[in-house]
């Protein structure tokens, strides 16, 4: 898209007259030098004509040799103030002027299009126009701030609405282990000659594992009541003490007879 600004030639208020006067003076001196070659060269006007013609020819040859394409542009854009320097803005407002036209040209684009950007000036190489160190290209290097869309961020309180699972108590898996250890310890203390009442006593330990539920801890309680762990241990200790007392009495009875 273009920008609705006037021709930037008006911004070089003194550039156009200076360039026109310089070219007309050089051309007049050149013509005077060629036309007055038969006159006395040692006179003041003759010396000025020779110097002016030499400067004009040097200027012309230098630009024809060094900046061929740029010289064509300078000749074409002579009367429109497009000379020596090149300025380009993002709104495609361009101008070629002498004495810092980029600041004026880009400022016109800047004010017209209301682009709140930063303008950077620097020497650049324009393809097809030779390596001209005097060409200054100014361009928009920072885009205007774009209003970001409002994104709804949920407050942290909503994230904490997730159900919190309370820690479950540990399952009583450690109870059968001491029972197994005690069952292993019983054969060690028992003598080889068992009394006739031992089968009735040994029938209690296998009945205890059947009372323990085999399901998870949150399952429904069984129909038969369970004995607390302390009561079961006390019963086992009493049974063992009774068995030991019976064995001692039997041994004393045997030794007495």
Swiss-Prot record:
Residues 164-175, 214-228 have a biased composition (Pro residues). One of its GO terms (cellular component) is membrane. Keywords: Host Golgi apparatus, Host membrane, Membrane, Transmembrane, Transmembrane helix. It is found in: Host Golgi apparatus membrane. Its main location: host cell. Residues 149-232 are annotated as: Disordered. Disulfide bonds: none annotated. It comes from the Viruses. It is a multi-pass membrane protein. Residues 179-193 have a biased composition (Basic residues). The chain crosses the membrane at residues 14-34, 45-65. This is Protein UL133. The gene is UL133.
């Amino acid at each position: 898209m273009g920008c609705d600004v006037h021709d930037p030639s008006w911004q070089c208020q003194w550039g156009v007259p200076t360039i026109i006067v310089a070219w007309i003076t050089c051309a007049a001196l050149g013509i005077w030098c060629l036309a007055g070659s038969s006159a006395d060269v040692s006179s003041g006007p003759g010396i000025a004509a020779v110097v002016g013609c030499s400067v004009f020819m040097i200027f012309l040859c230098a630009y024809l040799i060094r900046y061929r394409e740029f010289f064509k542009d300078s000749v074409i854009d002579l009367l429109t103030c497009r000379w020596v320097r090149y300025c380009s803005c993002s709104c495609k407002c361009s101008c070629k002027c002498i004495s810092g036209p980029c600041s004026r040209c880009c400022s016109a684009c800047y004010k017209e299009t209301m682009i709140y950007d930063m303008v950077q000036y620097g020497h650049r190489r324009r393809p097809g126009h030779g390596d001209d160190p005097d060409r200054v290209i100014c361009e928009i290097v920072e885009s205007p701030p774009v209003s970001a869309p409002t994104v709804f961020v949920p407050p942290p309180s909503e994230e904490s609405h997730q159900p919190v699972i309370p820690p479950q108590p540990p399952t009583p898996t450690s109870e059968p282990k001491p029972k197994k250890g005690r069952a292993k310890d019983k054969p060690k203390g028992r003598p080889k000659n068992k009394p006739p009442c031992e089968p009735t006593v040994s029938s209690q330990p296998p009945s205890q594992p059947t009372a323990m539920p085999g399901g998870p801890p949150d399952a429904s309680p069984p129909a038969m009541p369970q004995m607390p762990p302390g009561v079961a241990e006390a019963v086992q200790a009493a049974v063992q003490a009774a068995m030991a007392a019976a064995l001692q009495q039997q041994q004393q009875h045997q030794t007495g007879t």
